[in-house]
Amino acid sequence: MTWQSDYSRDYEVKNHMECQNRSDKYIWSPHDAYFYKGLSELIVDIDRLIYLSLEKIRKDFVFINLSTDSLSEFINRDNEWLSAVKGKQVVLIAARKSEALANYWYYNSNIRGVVYAGLSRDIRKELVYVINGRFLRKDIKKDKITDREMEIIRMTAQGMQPKSIARIENCSVKTVYTHRRNAEAKLYSKIYKLVQ
């Protein structure tokens, strides 16, 4: 996979994603120390409840934190990060604002499952459920982003104006605003705030 690295941040993201191919780096993003440490400890803590060995999990799985801090990179580069984790069992850890995007990637990619990290959720139980391969489409209770909404989110994230998006998508400006409003309702946030 080749990344076009125009900025140092792109280089950092590339290095973090390439780390995932090494067996000792199975949690992305490793630069989020609290998430990395917390999830590592949680996986060790639930060891007796999962069918696979910890070594197999470290080797075959990638756990991705879809936090609002990193959503911009995931939206703008979804083909790249999905290619980077090809062949791995990908588990998305989704906060409330990223649930609809996680569901979109689950439906449209080879994602093993989604752990919804809401405040009232039992993350241990959900993590065991996904690792053990029991997460199914019927488990998705929340909305998912549609293909058209995702295209509009990507173009908005790139700084494109609704009029330009309408031309590219061959639709009216009103339709662009409607899709954007629908996506924002599912994301519980304005798109521009998520992709800053």
Curated annotation (Swiss-Prot):
Main location as per UniProt: cytoplasm
Stretches assigned to the HTH luxR-type domain: 138-196
A cellular-component GO term for this protein: transcription regulator complex
Keyword annotations from UniProtKB, A to Z: Activator, Cytoplasm, DNA-binding, Repressor, Transcription, Transcription regulation
Classification via InterPro entries: Sig_transdc_resp-reg_C-effctor, Tscrpt_reg_LuxR_C, WH-like_DNA-bd_sf
Compartment(s): Cytoplasm
Residues in the signal sequence: none
Annotated phenotype, changing H179P: Slightly increases motility
Induction: Negatively regulated by H-NS. Positively autoregulated. Also positively regulated by IHF.
GO terms, biological process: regulation of bacterial-type flagellum-dependent cell motility; regulation of DNA-templated transcription
Family membership: Belongs to the EcpR/MatA family.
Function text: Part of the ecpRABCDE operon, which encodes the E.coli common pilus (ECP). ECP is found in both commensal and pathogenic strains and plays a dual role in early-stage biofilm development and host cell recognition. Positively regulates the expression of the ecp operon. Also represses expression of the flagellar master operon flhDC, and consequently prevents flagellum biosynthesis and motility. Acts by binding to the regulatory region of the flhDC operon.
Protein name: HTH-type transcriptional regulator EcpR
Organism: Escherichia coli (strain K12)
Lineage: Bacteria, Pseudomonadati, Pseudomonadota, Gammaproteobacteria, Enterobacterales
Originating gene: ecpR
